[in-house]
């Protein structure tokens, strides 16, 4: 029974991965393996030291013709809603254990590592977790930035890491890949940074978001209201 359940879950996870990668219309959307390996070898370095992303699959069929425009127009209905129409399990809140387990499961299935972050993919993840796992959305939040964005939910082991895309690379990718996710990612970010997901197992033990940026948790930070609001203001973050 357990084996069959794991197989079905793996199949659903593969469906999520395909949605995130927008297969087959655009067969790209993550940092290439070589550059992802180079980035992972320098976890302590600043975001400016990370290597720039390359355009995967730029010569594949999704980069030719007008398939991309059609995919964009049906984005909301086809990518977000089509994962599952209604929840298949009872709804429940996210917990630390669930977050850790799901983080590792996604990593084992090759889901998010090196993939460009965007609001659209954020929504796809929310929809998947709610409909397939019954986890109520609203837990997937990250620190404000700029720089590395740490998950604000303790137990979620995927952080967002900025990568640099040189102007020459942007022009080349726009020519060969139409609208590459690297461009979309920077549009979605208030600081204009291009972000990728990166797995960090140490986040299961170190609540980095809270320890470094307690002001972002507002009244839950334990700080006096005047202090956490002053910290947010100094960083240019709205306090309303």
Swiss-Prot record:
Residues 11-50 have a biased composition (Basic and acidic residues). The keyword Lipoprotein applies. It is a lipid-anchor. It comes from the Viruses. Residues 1-84 are annotated as: Disordered. GO terms for cellular component: host cell plasma membrane; membrane. Residues 70-80 have a biased composition (Acidic residues). Residues 70-78 are annotated as: Acidic. Keywords: AIDS, Host cell membrane, Host membrane, Host-virus interaction, Lipoprotein, Membrane, Myristate, Viral immunoevasion, Virulence. InterPro entries: HIV-1_Nef_core_sf, HIV_Nef. A motif (PxxP) lies at residues 87-90. Coiled coil: none annotated. Belongs to the lentivirus primate group Nef protein family. The N-terminal domain is composed of the N-myristoyl glycine and of a cluster of positively charged amino acids. It is required for inner plasma membrane targeting of Nef and virion incorporation, and thereby for infectivity. This is Protein Nef. The gene is nef.
